[in-house]
Amino acid sequence: MSNKAKIEVFPELESATGQMIIIDEQTKKCAILDSVLNYTQNNGRTSTKDADKLIAYIKENQLEPEWILETHIHADHLSGAHYLKGIYPNAKTAIGEGAKIVQKTFKTIYNLEHTFPTDGSQFDKLFTDDERFTIGSLQVRVISTPGHTPACVSYYIENDSVFVGDTMFMPDVGTARCDFPNGSAETLWTSMKKILELPETVKVYVCHDYPPQERGITFFTTIAEQRLSNKHIKDSVTKDEFIKMRTERDATLKAPQLLLPSIQVNIRAGELPPKEDNGISYIKIPLNYLKQ
């Protein structure tokens, strides 16, 4: 079996998200990772323009999606997973089993309908730590990497590439915030160290990039480069230094612009909230709840 993947990245620029297609060229099977449903907050409209780019590429290259993967319950964009599942009904939607914790937390915050399940059943598959699965002939290992959220997982194609979601970012950007409910800087440190123990030649694919002005947007680096120069987590940084930096920095951050709409859609695996008796679906906004 081959274990070299072809990766195509489709940036969604509003949320700086790197939608990805992970391809096994031997079998033409693929997985879609961290897709986006476009959302315009000032008029409450959704569109599928960026997810449609994935569909067009898959069709043009005659690929067969086996998985629609999430690295976590995103708080900065709406997931395109439900839309894509409608296009590819045989592809399995999947996320880490920690999604159940996020569902339970936000069911209470949003005061959702009593019938909303918090067992992760909106997804076809909940991965456990160290679980294995395949994309065509590619062997993939799930690495539980909580800290940013309890649901975070990374997907590791052995000796080739790892998809880390919102754990670490590009070396000049650093790491993800840990101030969401059930987040933890100490837990994130432990999770990132698991990733950084992988071989130095492994390519690291990040979910977001917020580049400084002197470079363009990009979504991959290597384990070696992260260990050498990631400004938050390079080898010379101690655990105590990281926790202090991350905690102090998080205290200054405002909530992501699309936090409130994103989570209540993404805990449903990208499906919009159920329509009410007038045929309209609504996003709920908890007033005076967030810290800032």
From Swiss-Prot:
Keyword Metal-binding: yes
Keywords: Hydrolase, Metal-binding, Zinc
Keyword set includes Zinc: yes
Coiled coil (UniProt feature): none
One GO MF term: metal ion binding
Cofactor: Zn(2+)
Note describing how the cofactor binds: Binds 2 Zn(2+) ions per subunit.
Any single GO BP term: hydrogen sulfide metabolic process
SUPFAM superfamilies in UniProt: Metallo-hydrolase/oxidoreductase (SSF56281)
Enzyme Commission (EC) number: 3.-.-.-
Transmembrane segments: none
Amino-acid positions noted as binding Zn(2+) 1 in the UniProt annotation, renumbered to this chain: H72, H74, H148, D166
Positions of substrate binding: T175, A176, R177, C178, D179, F180, P181, H208, D209, Y210, K284, I285, P286, L287
Residues holding Zn(2+) 2: D76, H77, D166, H208
Family named by the database record: Belongs to the metallo-beta-lactamase superfamily. Glyoxalase II family.
The protein's name: Glyoxylase B2
Species for this entry: Dictyostelium discoideum
